[in-house]
Amino acid sequence: MRSSGLTSDANQRGTIVTVLRILLAGLALAALAACSPAKAPQAPAGQTEIRFATDWRAQAEQGGFYQALATGEYAKRGLKVTILQGGPAVNVPQLLASGAVDLGMGSNSFIALNLAAEKAPVKAVAAFMQKDPQVLIAHPDQGIKSLADMKGRPILLADASVTAFWVWLKSKYGFTDDQVRKYNYSAAPFLADPKAIQQGYVTSEPYTIEKEGGFKPSVFLLADEGYPGYAAMVLAPDSLIAKDPKAVKAFIEASAAGWASYLNGDPRPGDALILKDNPEMTQALLDQARAKMKAYGLVEAGDAKTGGIGMMTDARWVDFFKIASSQGVFAKDLDVRKAYDLQFVSPKAP
């Protein structure tokens, strides 16, 4: 998922095409491997095993999944779930393609549409963040009052972001690729350069910068500036959707219950598993991240208010696709409905 971030849009899209062609080849190999007796350990009788890969190291932004595991929400629905944490070298679509995992976490809406564009048999089946938590962060004394003020300034970006929200920023605000600087997940370059701007999650990097730099940075949540993407999506292979839709539905229902509990109940069970998986995490960071998820409505705002946690709609996906395709990211004749499946999310009963 992570490339140099300094190439042209055409080269970026070419990289995506290459990766997804590898993904499709991997799916074919996975189908052959399914005939082999060398399978993963089976779940206990009456339980379905689900291996779920997250998109980053264990953190509060995955708290609902860990909470569902810790409080038995998956088990009570007949699932034996293993959470495999991600990281900078983890490619969730490739893990799905190889059969190494059953479900995966998609960071943003571009991922699902990229898969659809390459006819990869993987779909988004739920979105556990109605607002993408991505932010741009600036020093408070640089006269930056809006995203538009960042044009022409150096911006520290992760490789994956160059083919995601950066495309939207270039189109809407006229940003250019020569502004991009490599983001290595350290605040040090940002702190060393008062003119620098860096990406981050509203739940993480602003807190780290405040602690390490001793000042409160200016923070701009892209979702509040019109960026329409979902985040924290669950990706499912078409094969699993067809073979065991009940397991997919159970996973989504249990995860929604886990998120409700994590945000509005006692988060300690989920936090304990997060801290176990990621010893570099701290309780203070978890606490402030959870508070910000609630304050910004990342999980429970938008369609989740009426449809429940995890909700997705045709209208929201079509809106995102229209914006992306109008910017030349996707062909306008792409069938956006190949990117997602709404059968597992439905409005709450009145």
Task: Locate the predicted segments by residue.
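C-terminal motif of bacterial Sec signal peptides marking the signal peptidase cleavage site
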Residues: 31-34
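Short, glycine-/small- and polar/acidic-enriched structural segments
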Residues: 41-183, 187-203, 220, 228
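Periplasmic-binding protein-like
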Residues: 128-138, 214-244, 252, 290-296, ...
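Conserved C-terminal helix/tail region of periplasmic/extracytoplasmic solute-binding proteins
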Residues: 314-350
